[in-house]
Amino acid sequence: HSIEGGAVAFHDPELKDLLYQLKNFGITGYEQVEYVGANGKMNEFQAAMGLCNLRHVDADIAKRKVLTERYRERLGGVEGIRLCKEKAGVRYNYAYMPVVFEGYGADRDEIFAALKEYNIFARKYFYPCINDYACYREQFSSDDTPVAKRIASEVLTLPLYPDLSLETVDEICDIIL
């Protein structure tokens, strides 16, 4: 990691200019803006932290893969628990472990609360649904996006980081199951 926000690494040199422009508000030249961009610049300290951590990326991904496989082994095939399908030919970074609780014996919020009792902090990603944010509520209704509304209430992202132990993954799964 590079402290806050992250970094981009890629193999395709043609992406360099595009990514530079996107991280600089979409500016492509003097008084020229071609893309909807953002302020994606980092300071020198963040860059140094990112460079120091870059050497650990492959090992961290390998550790996360082992942990993800354990979650899949324990939670896969359980009725009412849906895991994201992995696609052939895709190289995953195993950054997140999202789980959808749909028709399981406990709902997402009950699982969240049960884990919290054991000081295990899962995350309710995509919640609340973006069109329920105060700044959008008057323009949009989550009733207009029923699938997003449902998924926002069912997804729980379980802890997944390189130093997490298999024993802790098993404890998390035991609490859920």
Predicted regions span which residues?
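Glycine-rich phosphate-binding loop of ATP-grasp-fold ATP-dependent ligases
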Residues: 3-8
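PLP-dependent aminotransferase class I/II
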Residues: 11-177
